[in-house]
Amino acid sequence: MADNKPYKSYFLDPLWNNNQPLIAILGICSALAVTTTVKTAITMGLAVSFVTGCSSFFVSLLRKITPDSVRMITQLIIISLFVIVIDQFLKAFFFNISKTLSVFVGLIITNCIVMGRAESLARNVPPIPAFLDGLASGLGYGWVLVFVSIIREFFGFGTLLGLQLIPKCFYASEAHPDGYENFGLMVLAPSAFFLLGIMIWVVNILRSKKAKR
């Protein structure tokens, strides 16, 4: 892999052109659990960015002294180290969010994006480009989660970041039975897959139109 690629490209490409959930269709399973609210989506996006960036950096740093026979085991050990760090950090300083995310922080180690960037790029390039790519891959994953969570939280709960945006007086009550009701489907896990599917469809249309120009 060419090492003379500009650092800017390593950071910008994963945000859109090589966005892992939208282009490579990786890391979408966690969208079921962590996109019901914007807070959890932001937290998971930042956690994955930290783990992917740091693990890619150290995989690259150790690439020349890591025997090929234990390459993937070494990568998993590095990834699990940073997953433990972020998990303990959230439990220490953001306990409520950590409790909401439950086991899904620990399951970052199974996220295909983290291992994918380590295996496909980090072991082939110097540490700085590897870190930029890993960080941006996590951020690219994160903004997709946040976009989905904004729609789900607003229509499912009438809130954003826990703030009530739809006035309580608009909701149905005994006095006004025909008032507004939250869109219950958005609270259910399958809605995340529907929204991701629509996003992937729109992105493919935009990419195909751009390719024809």
UniProtKB/Swiss-Prot annotation:
EC numbers, comma separated: 7.2.1.1
Gene Ontology CC entries for this record: plasma membrane
Keyword vocabulary terms for this entry: Cell inner membrane, Cell membrane, Ion transport, Membrane, NAD, Sodium, Sodium transport, Translocase, Transmembrane, Transmembrane helix, Transport, Ubiquinone
Spans through the membrane: 21-41, 42-62, 77-97, 101-121, 131-151, 183-203
GO molecular function: oxidoreductase activity, acting on NAD(P)H, quinone or similar compound as acceptor
Pfam family, one: Rnf-Nqr
Gene Ontology biological process terms from the UniProt entry: sodium ion transport
Membrane topology: Multi-pass membrane protein
Localisation per UniProt entry: Cell inner membrane
UniProt xrefs under InterPro entries: NqrD, NqrDE/RnfAE
Origin: domain of life: Bacteria
Main location: membrane
Swiss-Prot/TrEMBL catalytic activity: a ubiquinone + n Na(+)(in) + NADH + H(+) = a ubiquinol + n Na(+)(out) + NAD(+)
UniProt xrefs under PANTHER family: ELECTRON TRANSPORT COMPLEX PROTEIN RNFE, NA(+)-TRANSLOCATING NADH-QUINONE REDUCTASE SUBUNIT D
Entry's family note: Belongs to the NqrDE/RnfAE family.
NCBIfam families in alphabetical order: nqrD (TIGR01939), PRK09292.1 (NF006777), PRK12405.1 (NF009070)
Complexes and interactors: Composed of six subunits; NqrA, NqrB, NqrC, NqrD, NqrE and NqrF.
Role noted for this protein: NQR complex catalyzes the reduction of ubiquinone-1 to ubiquinol by two successive reactions, coupled with the transport of Na(+) ions from the cytoplasm to the periplasm. NqrA to NqrE are probably involved in the second step, the conversion of ubisemiquinone to ubiquinol.
HAMAP family xrefs: NqrD
Name by which UniProt lists this protein: Na(+)-translocating NADH-quinone reductase subunit D
Encoding gene (name): nqrD
